[in-house]
């Protein structure tokens, strides 16, 4: 399943994995998963977190390792309901729900994920996605960036 992913996608997932894996032990626990999800404005119960881990935990050790995450991501990317997931992701970034992701909103979410970005890095991320040049990212631009991955 994971062999359908590009090297670039795998590198991005590795980066995301290390954001979740707070103690760097190579495994994501329910506690680490919960921390990241709460920083993204979600509020999963302990049971929901356990279900998410169990869904991917191939070796049954109660945590997610990187190969298990890759399999989950490959499966999710094949799912056709990605439109709804994209809308949900956009809503997480668009804090004031005005239909646009500003540099401040992007910085806020990335900081919550543990990514300390300089103003230049945030501006660069906006510039890369900002097709119409208005200095922020609308939903169409967001989808384009996410689908290009």
Swiss-Prot record:
User: Mind telling me which PROSITE patterns this protein's record contains?
Assistant: EF_HAND_1 (PS00018), EF_HAND_2 (PS50222)
Residues that bind Ca(2+) 1 = 21, 23, 25, 27, 32
One cellular component term from this protein's GO annotations in UniProt: cytoplasm
| Chain sites annotated for binding Ca(2+) 2 | 57, 59, 61, 63, 68
Which residues does this entry mark as bearing N-acetylalanine?
2
Keyword annotations from UniProtKB, A to Z: Acetylation, Calcium, Metal-binding, Methylation, Repeat
Residues bound to Ca(2+) 3: 94, 96, 98, 105
Q: What does this protein do?
A: Calmodulin mediates the control of a large number of enzymes, ion channels and other proteins by Ca(2+). Among the enzymes to be stimulated by the calmodulin-Ca(2+) complex are a number of protein kinases and phosphatases.
Q: What is this protein called?
A: Calmodulin
Lineage from the top down? Eukaryota, Viridiplantae, Streptophyta, Embryophyta, Tracheophyta
Gene name as annotated: CALM1
């Amino acid at each position: 399943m994971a062999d359908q992913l590009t090297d670039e996608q795998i590198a991005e997932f590795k980066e995301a994995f290390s954001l979740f894996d707070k103690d760097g032990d190579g495994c994501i626990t329910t506690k680490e998963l919960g921390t990241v999800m709460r920083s993204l404005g979600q509020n999963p119960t302990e049971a929901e977190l356990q279900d998410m881990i169990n869904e991917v935990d191939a070796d049954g050790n109660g945590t997610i390792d990187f190969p298990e995450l890759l399999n989950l991501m490959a499966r999710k990317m094949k799912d056709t309901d990605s439109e709804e997931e994209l809308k949900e992701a956009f809503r997480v970034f668009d804090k004031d729900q005005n239909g646009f992701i500003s540099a401040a909103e992007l910085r806020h979410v990335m900081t919550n994920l543990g990514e300390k970005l300089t103003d230049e890095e945030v501006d660069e991320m906006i510039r890369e996605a900002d097709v119409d040049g208005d200095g922020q990212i609308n939903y169409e631009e967001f989808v384009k960036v996410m689908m290009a991955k």
